[in-house]
From Swiss-Prot:
SUPFAM superfamilies: Ribosomal L11/L12e N-terminal domain (SSF54747), Ribosomal protein L11, C-terminal domain (SSF46906). HAMAP family: Ribosomal_uL11. This is Large ribosomal subunit protein uL11. It comes from the Bacteria. The gene is rplK. The lineage of its organism: Bacteria, Pseudomonadati, Coprothermobacterota, Coprothermobacteria, Coprothermobacterales. It comes from Coprothermobacter proteolyticus (strain ATCC 35245 / DSM 5265 / OCM 4 / BT).
Length: 141
């Protein structure tokens, strides 16, 4: 029989560098999860990812055990890194903060494919282009 799920939540953490400080400690502690066990397992699973922020879906069961699934970094994070900008535009339709090439967008789309709701690369590229547009990052050929 399957375990009873007590809680499900998502955290955005630096790969390989999770600590008991917020947001990890409070999110896990209030649900009775062993914080240090989570940190050790998460850091081991993401150590090879480098310096990126990764979303992690945590499922806590009624017996206080847990599982987690590491997802791909957010498209906005990857776009900011590719465009070499600190943050997106406050007025995306008026002010552009950076540029990315179509090849960079395709690379990001390939990396994000498993988390996007499409199997088609061209559709994935359009999704990433839309994210870039909403951040004030221009896509050039």
């Amino acid at each position: 029989m399957a375990k009873k799920i007590a809680a499900q939540f998502r955290l955005l953490l630096p790969a390989g560098k999770a600590t008991p400080a917020p947001p990890v400690g409070p999110a896990l502690g209030q649900r009775g999860v062993n914080i240090m066990e989570f940190i050790k397992r998460f850091n081991a699973a993401t150590a090879s990812m480098g310096d990126v922020l990764v979303p992690v879906d945590v499922t806590v069961f009624a017996d206080k055990s847990f599982t987690f699934e590491v997802r791909t970094p957010p498209a906005s994070f990857l776009l900011k890194k590719a465009a070499k900008v600190e943050k997106g535009s406050g007025e995306p339709n008026k002010v552009t903060v950076g540029k990315v090439t179509r090849a960079q967008v395709e690379e990001i789309a390939k990396q994000k494919m498993k988390d996007l709701n499409t199997e088609d690369l061209e559709a994935a590229v359009r999704i990433i282009e839309g994210t870039a547009r909403s951040m004030g990052i221009q896509v050039v050929d």
